[in-house]
Amino acid sequence: MADMGAFREAVIAWAAGGPGDRARELATRLPVRAAVLLEGPSDVAAVGALAASRGRNLAAEGVCVLSMGGAMSVGRFARLLGPSGLGLRLTGLCDEAERGYYARGLERAHAAQFSAAQPSAARSNAAQSNAAQPHAAQPDPAQRRIFVCAVDLEDELIRALGVTRVEELVRAEGDLRALQTFLRQPAQRGRSSQQQLRRFLGTKKGRKIHYARVLAEALDPARMPAPLDGLLTSL
């Protein structure tokens, strides 16, 4: 029986230059109604875990959560999946540094109605400004389908959980000694504990993916970072 994983694999093969017939067939058969464009597999792991914490199964809802292998690929995937391709509703999550790739890629794919949402800090400031101006025009929700992490997804999760809780999770996962060794490196001097933890998560192959899921599962749904909350609410 065809599933969302098969559709995801078909889309990735199509984006790599293969035929698109299989993706088109599965999009209709499943059916698929929306695609979430993410930079990498750690983002997919976190989004899946956070959705599950809210009792949601995105695949069963017809939502394909897709790792593109980097933000520079967003234009290619948007062309295949968006208005000029399969006609799916597009949304996504990106790092602040990659905002431009998303904006340009979506515009070139004739999906200009999708614009980058503000990162957490900017959203907070905007909310305060709007509260002071009750008659100010509010952004159209349809214009806020790309959600931007202030630094990256790991940074959002670490800030939401707090350094102490993340260190407890690292200990529980059996990586405390590796973390202590990492923290003794001269390059880590002068960095905040939050910055050190974020860098630690990317020091070993597979660690970022693993901890994206661990941190997301440990997060209280009520404390979900704004970009992630916005993404899930939009789906």
Each model region followed by its residue ranges:
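N-terminal segment of the mature folded domain
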Residues: R89-Y101, L106
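Activity-critical C-terminal alpha-helical subdomain
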Residues: Y102, E107-S115, A137-S193
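Conserved beta-strand -> loop -> alpha-helix junction used to position metal-binding or nucleic-acid-contacting
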Residues: A59-A71, E96, D140-E156
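RecA-like P-loop NTPase motor core
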Residues: M1-T91
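Short phosphate-engaging motifs
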Residues: D43, S73, E98-G100, L153, ...
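Long, intrinsically disordered low-complexity tandem-repeat segments
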Residues: A112-P139
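Charged phosphate-binding loop/patch that engages nucleotide di/tri-phosphates or the phosphate backbone
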Residues: S193-L235
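Residues that form generic nucleotide/phosphate-binding pockets
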Residues: L80, E156, A160, L169, ...
